[in-house]
């Protein structure tokens, strides 16, 4: 039996039904990018989360962005800041307040995902963190983020990491 899969290639219509539409993972990647910028702004300017969210929604087209995920990250990271920072500290060679603010935003977002979004595989969290650091961080910031997340993931997702490495 052939299922009715709307994403399936139709030889009479060479353009798939989802052509031009970003995937769920692409929409989440965009949400993470905006959330990184918003978390940086929150950390540096100390504006309220609602003000930052409103401004980002005015300044950006959310058509191709997972807006709910952006909001969840933007409000979830500050709400869990103490838990996130406590998890990060053992994996750092510097104090939290000595970290580059962009790399701190990326690390907090990634740590939040490791702690609160167990539906997102740890390898995806690490990869997305590295990519965010490449886009927004310093020249070698992605290497630093990778090193920290590689230490952190087994602490927060021990069973998942062990299962993957078998």
Curated annotation (Swiss-Prot):
Pfam families listed in its UniProt record: NusB (PF01029)
GO cellular component, one term: cytosol
Descriptive protein name: Transcription antitermination protein NusB
Functional note: Involved in transcription antitermination. Required for transcription of ribosomal RNA (rRNA) genes. Binds specifically to the boxA antiterminator sequence of the ribosomal RNA (rrn) operons.
Native organism taxonomy: Bacteria, Pseudomonadati, Pseudomonadota, Gammaproteobacteria, Pseudomonadales
Keywords carried by this UniProt record: RNA-binding, Transcription, Transcription antitermination, Transcription regulation
GO molecular function: RNA binding
Basic and acidic residues: compositionally biased ranges: 1-15
Family under the similarity heading: Belongs to the NusB family.
Disulfide bonds: none
Organism of origin: Pseudomonas fluorescens (strain ATCC BAA-477 / NRRL B-23932 / Pf-5)
């Amino acid at each position: 039996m052939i299922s009715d899969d709307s994403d399936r290639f139709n030889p009479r219509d060479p353009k798939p039904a989802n052509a031009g539409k970003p995937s769920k993972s692409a929409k989440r990647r965009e949400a993470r990018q905006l959330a990184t910028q918003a978390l940086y702004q929150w950390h540096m300017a100390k504006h309220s989360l609602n003000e930052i969210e409103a401004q980002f929604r005015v300044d950006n087209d959310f058509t191709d962005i997972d807006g709910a995920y952006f909001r969840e990250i933007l409000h979830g990271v500050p709400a869990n800041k103490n838990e996130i920072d406590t998890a990060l500290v053992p994996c750092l060679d510097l104090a939290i307040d000595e970290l580059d603010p962009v790399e701190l935003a990326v690390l907090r977002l990634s740590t939040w995902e490791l702690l609160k979004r167990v539906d997102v595989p740890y390898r995806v969290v690490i990869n997305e963190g590295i990519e965010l650091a490449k886009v927004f961080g310093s020249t070698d910031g992605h290497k630093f983020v990778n090193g920290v997340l590689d230490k952190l993931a087994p602490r927060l997702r021990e069973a998942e990491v062990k299962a993957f490495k078998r």
